[in-house]
A protein has these predicted regions:
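N-terminal hydrophobic targeting/anchoring segments and the immediately downstream early-domain regions
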Residues: 2-27, 144-152, 158-160, 164
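Histidine/acidic residue-rich metal-binding segments in metalloenzymes
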Residues: 15-123, 127-146
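Short, solvent-exposed linear motifs at loop/edge-of-secondary-structure regions
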Residues: 63-64, 69-99, 220, 225-233, ...
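Residue-level "edge-of-site" marker
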Residues: 72, 95, 124, 296-297, ...
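Short linear, low-complexity motifs centered on an aromatic residue
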Residues: 99-114, 128, 133-134, 240-242, ...
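Short, intrinsically disordered, low-complexity segments enriched in Ser/Thr and Pro
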Residues: 110-144, 262, 385-387, 509-519, ...
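Glycine-rich, acidic/polar active-site loops that bind/position phosphate-bearing ligands
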Residues: 148-339, 348-351, 358-599
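C-terminal amphipathic alpha-helical interaction region
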Residues: 532-688
Length: 688
């Protein structure tokens, strides 16, 4: 009997080892191999001259301008370190506005003129590269006859080594810009937004500082990203044209058993998947990515892996690298990793929770309630600032998670709704309510929190329950933004968060600075907090965000309900948004408008691709199958009639009629979709 391709694929699965590929774990401990392929502080100390090492560390730790005089020395040390691992090439690794990573690789060799070659790597080659900027999304900033672009070394994110079966490449994280200086990537505005946040956050901290208290020299955002994904055997994946082209199924029947019994979440991980995860963890640890957690997610074949938090630029780089490695390691295990937000209809989709906090170079988490009055006052100001920022810029925050894939996920009972709201937890909400009401204190475990002269309940570290329906939830010492999609870069949500928080902190700083110094500690700062919370309390919601009643309540409060990507993108070019990014030098008007054009075009192209794939599958797979079924049924009906006259064949006739009607409906749907899709896309400009 001849097997169908699907039957052959399923049969092959039965003979695959359930434990997957065995990973050869090195004899050394994790602590010895962690960061082994990263040009980290230990490698820098070993390979750099002492004075160069100190200057480079000052740039990295304090955000100081890089001293150009050390570039050659750093480049040579980086090259020597990489060559010691067998590296032959280097690349400037950047994140264009495709949502993926990009690079161009060059070798270290320099011909000597005598038929030999030496290995060289100059400071100029380290600090600047020159890729073609017109072949990547630019929103009209770069075109084919104006194609020059530059990559610039980002010393804040360490260089690392990428291994392939036939070699090793030194990979250098970089920013990407045009010849005119316009940012063409996601990293550049993230770095700029961190600088804006640093200025305004230190301004507020200086206003709160006590005599003799050490002052922060640098403030920055920290992020921990929870990455969700699906796994499928590669043989089954390649049987699906829709999954190959779109990353999700466009057609299909629901399985007899999905996630109804809630028996997959946190269940024992299958051996083959666990082998994949262990192999992936080893690669991640060697690259200095602090992966911490692994577990089954809610849907069958869905999983999650999450790292410990890092500074926002490094965290975003590491998440992009992790997504690359998810695909690479899955391939080695005969699996395919699906990062689409909704690969299967009827099953939970995948997200990427963005855990956001703000820290200082002194080790303080400014979103931690703390243990004394000074820390609690600082916490309440930064908490208030972020609440105000989210309320004022709901549209921007919603736009950061707008995509064709995420539209299938947001608003279903598996992810936060499209309405942005903030959850604080009952205890902290009580503190906020007491402040707004002007009450001197409330009760919480019998303790009190002192804000200058007034008292409020002492805040325990775990002040919240977990409201998994909330898009923006406080979780004890950070905010968890739960709306980002699993496949997206986290740079966009985080440079928006940094920028809107910087604006909010500046507003609060101006209000405090306007107070007489004697009044600041005598209830003045508390009044600023109260007035700000009163103005923005509408964004706070402690209940079920899935409930229909919340949609109605949100409308009464004047909150935005941007249900899909077109609605969210429709507000991006509002004057207030353009002015915000220009004010804090995060993005110019030209840069911002180019991004909105790119996001809109990406959304439309995604839908066009899905439409073309749907037409192709329907016309070449389903329609012929329907015609074959019709022919087979008609032959069967004719044979039955010829074999015995007088048989009751109503059921068979109805079945044949149903098949014929379905074929007719399918052809009409194909024609209609072709008509709505319109003409095929114009061929792109030739690229030299």
């Amino acid at each position: 009997m001849t097997l169908t391709p699907r039957q052959a694929a399923v049969r092959s699965l039965a003979f695959k080892a359930t434990t997957g590929e065995r990973v050869s774990i090195p004899a050394e401990s994790i602590s010895d191999s962690y960061g082994a392929y990263v040009f980290n502080i230990e490698a820098q100390r070993k390979y750099l001259p002492g004075n160069v090492f100190k200057k480079l560390r000052r740039t990295i730790s304090q955000g100081a301008t890089l001293d150009p005089s050390i570039a050659d020395s750093v480049a040579n040390a980086m090259k020597n370190w990489a060559v010691s691992f067998g590296a032959t090439h280097y690349s400037h690794w950047f994140q264009p506005m495709t949502g993926h990573t990009a690079e161009k690789q060059d070798s270290f060799i320099t011909p000597t003129g005598t038929g030999t070659a030496i290995l060289e790597f100059s400071g100029k080659e380290l600090t600047q590269g020159e890729p073609d900027a017109s072949s990547l999304p630019s929103g009209g900033i770069r075109v084919t006859f104006e194609a020059r672009g530059y990559t610039a070394w980002d010393p804040m994110s360490p260089a690392f080594l990428r291994h392939s079966p036939n070699g090793v490449t030194l990979t250098i994280p970089t920013a990407f810009c045009s010849w005119t200086g316009d940012a063409l990537d996601t990293k550049t505005p993230l770095l700029r937004s961190n600088a804006a946040l640093d200025v305004q956050a230190r301004r507020v901290l200086d206003l709160l500082s006590e005599p003799g208290e050490a002052r922060a020299k640098r403030v920055f955002a920290n992020v921990g990203a929870e990455q969700e994904f699906f796994l499928i055997d590669r043989e089954l994946f390649y049987l699906r044209p829709d999954m190959m082209a779109c990353g999700r199924t466009l057609f299909g029947a629901a399985p007899p058993k999905g996630q109804e019994q809630n028996d997959h979440y946190f269940a024992t991980t299958p051996g083959r998947v666990l082998a994949f995860m262990q192999d992936l963890e080893r690669h991640l640890w060697q690259l200095g990515i602090p992966i911490k957690t692994r577990h089954n997610e809610v849907a069958p074949a869905q999983y999650e892996m999450a790292p410990i938090y890092e500074s926002v630029t490094v965290a975003c780089d590491h998440n992009m690298l992790m997504m690359d490695l998810l695909h690479e390691v899955a391939r080695a295990h005969g699996l395919k990793c699906l990062l689409h937000e909704k690969p299967y209809r009827g099953l939970n989709g995948s997200g990427k929770h963005n855990n956001y906090s703000v820290g200082t170079d002194l080790g303080h988490n400014l979103l931690d309630p703390g243990t004394n009055p000074h820390e609690n006052l600082r916490f309440m100001i930064f908490l208030t600032a972020l609440i105000a920022a989210v309320d004022k810029h709901q549209d921007l925050l919603r736009s950061t998670v707008a995509s064709a894939g995420n539209d299938h996920r947001l608003g279903a009972h598996e992810a936060p709704p499209a309405i942005i709201s903030v959850f604080m937890g009952s205890d902290l909400q009580g503190v906020i309510d007491a402040l707004i009401a002007g009450e001197g204190h409330g009760k919480l475990d019998g303790g009190k929190l002192h804000l200058g002269v007034s008292s409020l309940p002492k805040l325990p570290r775990d002040t919240t329950d977990r409201n998994r329906t909330s898009p923006f939830a406080f979780t004890g010492n950070k905010f968890e933004f739960r709306a980002p999609g699993s496949s997206q870069s986290l740079a966009y949500p985080n440079y928006v968060l940094n920028t809107i928080l910087a604006e909010s902190l500046e507003t609060i700083a101006e209000q405090i600075e306007a107070l007489p110094k004697a009044d600041r500690k005598n209830g003045g700062i508390q009044n600023v907090i109260r007035e700000t919370l009163t103005l923005h309390k509408r964004i706070l919601f402690p209940g079920d965000n899935y409930a229909d009643a919340w949609t109605q309540e949100a409308e009464k409060r004047g909150l935005l309900n941007l249900r899909d990507t077109p609605a969210a993108l429709g507000m991006l070019n509002d004057a207030k948004n353009v002015a915000l990014f220009e004010k804090y030098s995060v993005l110019s008007e030209r840069e911002w408008l180019s991004r909105t054009a790119i996001v809109s075009e990406a959304y439309m192209e995604k839908l066009r691709v899905e439409a073309r794939v749907a037409i192709d599958m329907a016309a070449t797979l389903f329609l012929p199958a329907g015609l074959r079924a019709q022919h087979k049924t008609a032959d069967s009906l004719s044979a039955a009639r010829g074999a015995c006259e007088g048989l009751n064949l109503d059921v068979q006739i109805n079945h044949l009629t149903k098949i014929a009607n379905l074929i007719s409906d399918l052809q009409e749907s194909i024609d209609l979709l072709r008509e709505r899709l319109g003409n095929p896309p114009v061929e792109p400009d030739p690229v030299a």
